[in-house]
């Protein structure tokens, strides 16, 4: 409801509101997108958005924040995967369990196909070990963002995980992604951002993944 009202106010003032998903601007993300294009495009994608319940549970947050934690936090990783491979045009989602700070769901899995005809799947278990990660597959390579700040590759015909060197000086000097994000904002390069009207469409996808009514 808040995003609907915010979008309405923005339109009434002729303003653009950009969602600050900084993972889109990581040097690892930018390098990955270039490599995917060189390979001829992605064929499939896997992502994980496991959260550390033992850390998040005790946190003091405002009303409703932890109860909608997927929207507040985990959507960063879903946005990254879908930014790279396209947003779902058809998918199925399953969720189960509950936590004392997140009643809607505890475990998540799903799969589908994006608007770019790329098959995807995801998984998360908020009561088990894990971390955020994205894997994008092409006909030549499997690219791994895990952690998201680093880019690794498994080449076809191999099982060896190799590190890909990237120029991540600004991501190390500042909070990752922030330098490129602010630069794009100041130079009015909005194409890399998620616009609020786009996010309004994505909310239904995120609610389905998270199990929110």
Where are these regions (language model features)?
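C-terminal helix-rich "cap/oligomerization" subdomain common to oxidoreductases
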Residues: 12, 183-213
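Active-site loop of classical SDR/Rossmann-like NAD(P)-dependent oxidoreductases
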Residues: 145, 168-183, 194-197
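Beta-strand-loop-alpha-helix segment that lines the small-molecule cofactor/substrate pocket
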Residues: 1-21
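Predominantly a Rossmann-like dinucleotide-binding segment in NAD(P)-dependent oxidoreductases
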Residues: 23-92
């Amino acid at each position: 409801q808040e995003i609907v009202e915010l979008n309405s106010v923005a339109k009434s003032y002729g303003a653009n509101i950009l969602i600050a998903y900084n993972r889109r601007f990581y040097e690892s993300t930018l390098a990955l997108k270039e490599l995917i294009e060189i390979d001829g495009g992605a064929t499939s994608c896997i992502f994980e958005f496991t959260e550390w319940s033992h850390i998040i549970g005790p946190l003091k947050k405002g009303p409703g924040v932890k109860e909608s934690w997927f929207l507040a936090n985990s959507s960063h990783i879903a946005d990254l995967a879908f930014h790279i491979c396209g947003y779902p045009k058809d998918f199925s989602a399953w969720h189960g369990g509950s936590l004392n700070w997140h009643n809607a769901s505890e475990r998540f899995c799903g799969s589908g196909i994006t608007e770019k005809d790329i098959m995807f799947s995801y998984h998360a278990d908020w009561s088990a070990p894990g971390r955020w990660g994205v894997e994008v597959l092409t006909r030549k390579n499997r690219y791994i963002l895990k952690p998201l700040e680093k880019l690794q590759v498994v080449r076809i015909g191999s099982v060896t995980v190799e590190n890909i060197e990237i120029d991540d000086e600004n991501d190390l000097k500042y909070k990752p992604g922030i330098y490129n994000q602010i630069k794009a904002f100041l130079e009015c390069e909005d194409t890399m951002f998620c616009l609020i009207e786009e996010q309004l469409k994505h909310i239904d996808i995120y609610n389905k993944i998270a199990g929110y009514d």
